[in-house]
């Protein structure tokens, strides 16, 4: 790798000649060496020799007696530099005065010994060998250039076959392989008419002869003429490689090595152990092998040994070089003495223990310590308690400095002695030094940026760090033995950044969702809930006070009870309140209304209150207020003395009755099953449903019993008040526990899941207070243990997800104020079923509208385009008639390599406009990844109790109004009700508007989807009340319904082949089920089980209303409920397909589902979607597949091959719209992008991912997901290259594509066209323009091989590559420096040294340093 810079390179000959220049080169790192990029390319033999300081000729390392390096060996001092500073090997020249001298006796240069970390050597190979990376890394690069297969190449390189180099007049072709026998036979036949070679020499000759420009032209012509897709792909691959070589000025023959570099000895150390043994790096073994074989080969050449021996030696040399570069890539792994594989150069770079991830991305730092944390409730929010011993060690340099300044110590040594003796003055100085010097605390795992925060230290006795309770949520810390690390920012710049950006008081809001993260939890909430509760008939009720002081006195004196209802004058108003709430009122910031706390305070209320305070009063007031709230909460939690006893778990009296009633219902279902009215699957579904309802009813009863107390008030009447039951208070306040856990304590445990994931039909009717029977306990253990196992597995998965997300998004930075785009995405309120999951306001907060938003009815301007919407604007929009808004999004932002402020909107962690330079990609990745671990860890809290949602089986109205039907096709059944036959019908509910005595439909309020087979009881246009049920359906079975009256005729339903008659063991009844008929082909070829309806009189096949024949095709698993020859009426059910008995909806679907979406994988049971709208017909089936044809009004029909026996979502003759599913299952994200476009893909990804997190109650802002999806869409695939440089089918960066098109357009050429590509996050990370970032992520060798061939330049734009080369990252405060550098405002003389040390560099270079 070479830095792309303006600095001239120094050839080795000059270095060794001029000792003085060497000193300058190595005296100290040159700060001025500035570069804008790093290029990687293949090293030529000349280049390798120019790096080298001498040839390594012997395999010896060091002399075992003297421990001195052997001459010309792997550790030779002459080549690599002296072992001791400024001292030659033989000891003739010592000390600084001889520096730069080359000793004439031992040939060692007198210089610092650290050059042994920098100087390289080389080995001249006696025969060329192939570089294994270019040979074996798929696809083989040498193979692509020569158009040979890897197998053939290996045969030549490893001396099995000869290859024809020049065919001359013979019938052979160039590049043809010959066995040894054939070769000698041909030699006899043709003599030297032709030439063939073997081994790397032959391959090298072929590479030298390769004429790249001619090959490229030939391939381009071929590409134009070929029609075969496979051939085309092959040509494109080859073309790529050839063009890469042409553009990068790499010579193909450099992939065959004639000389190999030897890395500096300090990087492959050899350490003598006691007892005369040595510990050595594996590389030395590998190098030794190469040198031994190389020397032996040279000797064989001199001895003119027979060909076969030489060939064998050459093969062994090739193998040893292979092992040195990448051990185990080909053939057997070379092992050391203890049968352990040796670590090659590739292993030094790869993986978590490789150079990239271990030393370049993760460095250990000085001035840090770690200790156990304990709670520090008396600290202020910006403080932490630091043990004195730790502080003394961490702040040593500052203390030494201060001691010298004060004249208490004359030298550093004296200061050191004073500190070691821990004299009295030292402690005083420590206090001074620490004052207002922030330290950073970090708790591993650091899942998001709030895992490191800055605090001001307070010295404490003991050895534990004290942590403020309110920051525990951000760190995810508790005090059960957690440890934290302390880091000291040293420079003044670092201290400023720590104070301004990282101080805990500046991180009140969570970057994931913009809600406060500094919120009281647990005991504090319990205390606040207790002190704001109201109780009837206690001391002081009805008293009236003139101010809060009086209330406090009355409370302290015991006259007024904490819960007494009183009146008081507060801020000039009379308020009805309680004593406890008045005590809180004292702390309320000025601008917050008293009504905000004049209520029962739960966790939700506190969060709202702090959020409101932050928006109204700013940071300082919020911090003071939260600190006071915390103190008050702790104090009253202590005074409340809330405990937990078994009698607090109140079992509802109605429980027995409810359980008995449920058992009765279950018996009835069992009876229906034994009578054969329902199938086993239906029975299972219904039973599970009954128990789900029962469990919920019992839970509701229990909550009803426990949540209120009936007491006498002061007038002697019985009144209800919120309960003071301890368990209820804990759960209701949000301090600890949940309704689900209380249900298990005092309700019933409910349904449990089997190990397979299915739900068992028999629930646990007992609760923990009653105790479980042995069987119930046994059933429970599985759920509990599974939870623990899951936790361990998923923590790792979640960490890996975060790593991939960070990697894909790390170079997404806010680059500019406004990109000026006019496109965006439309958002509306999110509705699931009948509940609004997220309001329009929530989704718009902190976003920017594309155009002005006006009220559609009043035409009032609500917000101008380009304004970031804050709480007030959002409230205005909520109260207006606006349903959806087109907003700017990171997805549609047109900024290159980043996003703009306007498209991103509000910085969630600060509540203000995002600033240029903010690393929004990393924040997005952390916000999505951090709850990932919670998702995974939350499974076991409910201990496997199956919480299965009772299925929705009807639709009722949520408001009153007028019904309108859309796309609805119905048929009337025998009972006169309408049965829905369309697949995508919707019902909209409109406001009822009176017009000339008629009720008409006004603005649309809601829309409901009505499934196929639903029975509708209200007519279109009818006026309904709130809560009217207008449609019902069976949630557990999908019916197949007749549209006309006729006689049933079976087709292809052959008993024992495609039809199975199941006789139920328990009932003795027979049900007919369609089965899989694969492999049992009937005489007629393929089977298509179906039911046809014939006319009652003429026995001809009836026609449907849409003109197609009346045939119903049956999927595998359909249960037929009619018999052949039955007379059926329109709207009758002839067969039904049972829905799968639902598995437990646990978050196990969670993390894997999120990963599946971000990796853009095809879901297991994926569905197909219609690519255009048209009429559905069934085509001729293919083996194992069913052919579906969608014919549009105009244009070509589209064919889809669907797996047989899967439930289709459409019937023959249905009209489908573009993007509609043709069968059941999850859609493939790539299909959505292709068919419906970017906006629909965004909506799909955001909604699907949010749904997983919402199940866990985790809130993430949509824009984070949009940022990641943006990064997944950075590539496009060329469909037509036009006159550009691209090749058809090539994948290129979006920015490069646009740039090339602009250039071509200017030239007057034809521009290229493309389709957008959706890449999974792993693939997107690996195809990033920065090869350093990609190599440090995964597949290091492949990435580096590819980059070297194309001579790629890494322009160091992302964060990761800058960390690796040791610069400040170009984000946040480092953004300014990188911008200045780009603008070129830093003149050549004072190139940025990234750290403000230009003047140091100047001084150092101008003054000659003299040392004695």
Curated annotation (Swiss-Prot):
Transmembrane segments: none annotated. Keywords: DNA-directed RNA polymerase, Magnesium, Metal-binding, Nucleotidyltransferase, Transcription, Transferase, Zinc. InterPro entries: DNA-dir_RpoC_beta_prime (IPR045867), DNA-dir_RpoC_beta_prime_bact (IPR012754), RNA_pol_asu (IPR000722), RNA_pol_N (IPR006592), RNA_pol_Rpb1_1 (IPR007080), RNA_pol_Rpb1_3 (IPR007066), RNA_pol_Rpb1_3_sf (IPR042102), RNA_pol_Rpb1_4 (IPR007083). Its EC number is 2.7.7.6. Zn(2+) 2 binds at residues 819, 893, 900, 903. Mg(2+) binds at residues 478, 480, 482. It catalyses: RNA(n) + a ribonucleoside 5'-triphosphate = RNA(n+1) + diphosphate. It comes from the Bacteria. Zn(2+) 1 binds at residues 88, 90, 103, 106. Binds 1 Mg(2+) ion per subunit. Binds 2 Zn(2+) ions per subunit. One of its GO terms (biological process) is DNA-templated transcription. GO terms for molecular function: DNA binding; DNA-directed RNA polymerase activity; magnesium ion binding; zinc ion binding. Pfam families: RNA_pol_Rpb1_1, RNA_pol_Rpb1_2, RNA_pol_Rpb1_3, RNA_pol_Rpb1_4, RNA_pol_Rpb1_5. One of its GO terms (cellular component) is DNA-directed RNA polymerase complex. Its cofactor is Mg(2+); Zn(2+). Gene3D superfamilies: 1.10.132.30, 1.10.150.390, 1.10.1790.20, 1.10.40.90, 2.40.40.20, 2.40.50.100, RNA polymerase II, clamp domain (4.10.860.120), RNA polymerase Rpb1, domain 3 (1.10.274.100). Residues 1387-1412 are annotated as: Disordered. PANTHER family: DNA-DIRECTED RNA POLYMERASE, DNA-DIRECTED RNA POLYMERASE SUBUNIT BETA. The RNAP catalytic core consists of 2 alpha, 1 beta, 1 beta' and 1 omega subunit. When a sigma factor is associated with the core the holoenzyme is formed, which can initiate transcription. DNA-dependent RNA polymerase catalyzes the transcription of DNA into RNA using the four ribonucleoside triphosphates as substrates. HAMAP family: RNApol_bact_RpoC. Belongs to the RNA polymerase beta' chain family. This is DNA-directed RNA polymerase subunit beta'.
């Amino acid at each position: 790798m070479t830095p792309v810079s303006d600095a001239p390179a120094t050839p080795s000959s000059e270095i060794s000649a001029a000792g003085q220049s060497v000193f300058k080169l190595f005296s100290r790192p040159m700060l001025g060496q500035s570069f804008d990029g790093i290029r990687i390319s293949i090293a030529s033999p000349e280049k390798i020799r120019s790096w080298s300081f001498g040839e390594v000729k012997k395999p010896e390392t060091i002399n075992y007696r003297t421990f001195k390096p052997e001459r010309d060996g792997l550790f030779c001092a002459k080549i690599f530099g002296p072992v001791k500073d400024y001292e030659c090997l033989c000891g003739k020249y010592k000390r600084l005065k001889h520096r730069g001298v080359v000793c004439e006796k031992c040939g060692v240069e007198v210089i610092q010994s650290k050059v042994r970390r920098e100087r390289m050597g080389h080995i001249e190979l006696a025969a060329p060998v192939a570089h294994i990376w270019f040979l074996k890394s798929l696809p083989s690069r040498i193979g692509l250039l020569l158009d040979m297969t890897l197998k053939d190449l290996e045969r030549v390189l490893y001396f099995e076959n000869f290859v024809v180099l020049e065919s001359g007049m013979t019938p052979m072709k160039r590049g043809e392989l010959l066995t040894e026998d054939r070769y000698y036979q041909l030699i006899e036949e043709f003599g030297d008419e032709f030439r063939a070679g073997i081994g790397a020499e032959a391959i090298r000759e072929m590479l030298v002869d390769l004429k790249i420009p001619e090959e490229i032209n030939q391939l381009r012509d071929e590409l134009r003429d070929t029609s075969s897709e496979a051939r085309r792909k092959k040509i494109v691959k080859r073309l790529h490689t050839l063009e890469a070589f042409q553009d990068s000025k790499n010579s193909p023959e450099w992939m065959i090595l004639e000389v190999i570099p030897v890395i500096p000895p300090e990087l492959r150390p050899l350490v003598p152990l006691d007892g005369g043994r040595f510990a050595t790096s594996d590389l030395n073994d590998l190098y030794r092998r190469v040198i031994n074989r190389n020397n032996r080969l040279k000797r064989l050449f001199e001895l003119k040994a027979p060909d076969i021996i030489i060939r064998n030696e050459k093969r062994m040399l090739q193998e040893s070089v292979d092992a040195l570069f990448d051990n185990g890539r080909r053939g057997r792994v070379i092992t050391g003495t203890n049968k352990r594989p040796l670590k090659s150069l590739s292993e030094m770079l790869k993986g978590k223990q490789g150079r990239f991830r271990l030393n370049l991305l993760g460095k250990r730092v000085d001035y840090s310590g770690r200790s156990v944390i304990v709670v520090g409730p008396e600290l202020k929010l910006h403080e932490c308690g630091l043990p004195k011993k730790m502080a003394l060690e961490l702040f040593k340099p500052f203390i030494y400095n201060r001691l010298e300044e004060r004249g208490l110590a004359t030298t550093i040594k004296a200061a050191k002695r004073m500190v070691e003796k821990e004299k009295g003055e030292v402690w005083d100085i420590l206090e001074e030094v620490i004052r207002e010097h922030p330290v950073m605390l970090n708790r591993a795992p650091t899942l998001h940026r709030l895992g490191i925060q800055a605090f001001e230290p307070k010295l404490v006795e003991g050895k534990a760090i004290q942590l403020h309770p309110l920051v525990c949520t951000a760190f995810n810390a508790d005090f059960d033995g957690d440890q934290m690390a302390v880091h000291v920012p040293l420079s003044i710049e670092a201290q400023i950044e720590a104070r301004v950006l990282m101080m805990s008081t500046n991180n009140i809001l969570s970057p994931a969702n913009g809600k406060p993260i500094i919120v009281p939890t647990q005991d504090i909430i319990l205390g606040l809930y207790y002190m704001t509760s109201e109780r009837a008939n206690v001391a002081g009720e009805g008293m009236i006070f003139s101010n809060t002081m009086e209330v406090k006195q009355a409370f302290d004196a015991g006259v007024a009870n904490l819960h007494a209802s009183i009146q008081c004058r507060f801020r000039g108003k009379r308020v009805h309140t309680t004593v406890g709430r008045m005590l809180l009122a004292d702390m309320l910031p000025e601008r917050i209304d008293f009504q905000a706390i004049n209520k029962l305070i739960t966790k939700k209320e506190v969060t709202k209150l702090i959020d409101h305070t932050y928006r109204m009063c700013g940071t300082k007031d919020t911090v003071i207020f939260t600190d006071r709230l915390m103190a008050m909460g702790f104090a009253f939690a202590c005074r409340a003395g809330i405990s937990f006893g078994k009698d607090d778990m109140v079992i509802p009296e109605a429980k027995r009755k409810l359980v008995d009633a449920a058992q009765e219902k279950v018996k009835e279902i069992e009876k229906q099953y034994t009578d054969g009215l329902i199938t086993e699957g239906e029975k299972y579904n219904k039973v599970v449903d009954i128990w789900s309802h029962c469990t919920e009813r019992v839970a509701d009863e229990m909550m009803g019993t426990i949540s209120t107390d009936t007491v006498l008030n002061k007038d002697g009447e019985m009144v209800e008040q919120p309960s003071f039951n301890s368990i209820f208070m804990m759960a209701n306040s949000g301090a600890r526990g949940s309704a689900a856990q209380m249900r298990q304590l005092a309700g019933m445990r409910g349904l449990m899941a089997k190990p397979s994931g299915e739900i068992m039909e028999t629930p646990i009717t007992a609760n923990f207070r009653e105790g479980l029977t042995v069987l119930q306990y046994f059933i429970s253990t599985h759920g509990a243990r599974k939870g623990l196992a899951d936790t361990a597995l998923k923590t790792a998965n979640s960490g890996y997800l975060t790593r991939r997300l960070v990697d894909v998004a790390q170079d997404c930075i806010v680059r500019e104020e406004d990109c000026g785009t006019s496109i965006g995405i439309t958002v509306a309120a999110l509705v699931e079923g009948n509940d609004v999951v997220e309001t329009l306001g929530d989704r718009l907060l902190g976003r920017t509208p594309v155009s002005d938003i006006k009220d559609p009815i009043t035409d009032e301007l609500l917000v101008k385009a380009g304004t970031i919407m804050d709480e007030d604007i959002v409230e205005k929009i909520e109260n207006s008639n606006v349903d959806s808004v087109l907003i700017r999004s990171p997805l549609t932002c047109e900024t290159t390599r980043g996003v703009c402020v306007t498209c991103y909107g509000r910085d969630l962690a600060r509540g203000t406009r995002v600033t240029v330079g903010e690393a929004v990609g990393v924040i997005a990745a952390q916000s999505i990844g951090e709850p990932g671990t919670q998702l995974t860890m939350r499974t076991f809290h409910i201990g496997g109790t199956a919480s299965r949602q009772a299925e929705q089986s009807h639709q009722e109205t949520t408001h009153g109004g007028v019904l309108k039907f859309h796309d609805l096709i119905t048929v009337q059944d025998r009972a006169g009700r309408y049965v829905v036959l369309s697949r995508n019908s919707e019902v909209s509910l409109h406001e009822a508007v009176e017009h000339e005595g008629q009720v008409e439909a006004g603005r649309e309020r809601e829309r409901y989807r009505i499934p196929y087979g639903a029975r509708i009881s209200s007519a279109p246009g009818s006026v309904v009340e709130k809560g009217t049920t207008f449609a019902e359906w069976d949630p557990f079975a999908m019916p197949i319904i007749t549209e006309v009256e006729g006689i049933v005729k079976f087709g292809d339903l052959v008993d024992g082949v495609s039809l199975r008659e199941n006789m139920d063991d328990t009932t003795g009844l027979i049900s007919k089920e369609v089965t899989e008929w694969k492999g049992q082909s009937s005489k007629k070829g393929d089977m298509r089980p179906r039911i046809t309806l014939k006319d009652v009189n003429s026995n001809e096949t009836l026609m449907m209303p849409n003109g197609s024949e009346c045939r119903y095709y049956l999927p595998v698993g359909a249960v037929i409920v009619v018999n052949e020859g039955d007379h059926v009426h329109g709207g009758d059910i002839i067969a039904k397909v049972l829905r799968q008995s639902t598995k437990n909806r646990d978050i196990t679907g969670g993390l894997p589902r999120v990963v599946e979406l971000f990796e853009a994988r095809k879901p297991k049971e994926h569905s197909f979607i219609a690519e255009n709208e048209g009429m559905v017909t069934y085509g001729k089936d293919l083996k194992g597949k069913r052919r579906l044809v969608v014919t549009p009004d105009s244009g070509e029909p589209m064919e889809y091959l669907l797996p047989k026996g899967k439930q289709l979502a459409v019937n023959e003759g249905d009209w489908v719209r573009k993007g509609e599913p043709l069968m059941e299952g999850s859609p493939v994200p790539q299909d959505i992008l292709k068919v419906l476009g970017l906006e629909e893909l965004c909506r799909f990804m955001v909604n699907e991912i949010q749904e997983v997190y919402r199940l866990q109650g985790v809130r993430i802002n949509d824009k984070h997901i949009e940022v990641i999806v943006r990064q997944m869409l950075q590539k496009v695939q060329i469909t037509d290259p036009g006159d550009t440089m691209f090749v058809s089918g090539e994948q290129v960066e979006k920015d490069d594509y646009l740039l090339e098109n602009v250039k071509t357009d200017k030239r007057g050429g034809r521009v290229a066209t493309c389709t957008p590509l959706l890449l999974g996050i792993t693939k997107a990370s690996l195809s990033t323009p920065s090869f350093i970032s990609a190599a440090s992520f995964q597949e290091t060798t492949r990435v580096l091989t590819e980059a070297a061939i194309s001579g790629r330049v890494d322009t160091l734009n992302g964060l990761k590559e800058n960390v690796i080369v040791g610069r400040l990252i170009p984000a946040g405060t480092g953004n300014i420096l990188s911008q200045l550098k780009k603008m070129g405002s830093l003149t050549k003389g004072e190139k940025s040294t990234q750290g403000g040390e230009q003047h140091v560099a100047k001084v150092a270079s101008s003054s000659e340093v003299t040392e004695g």
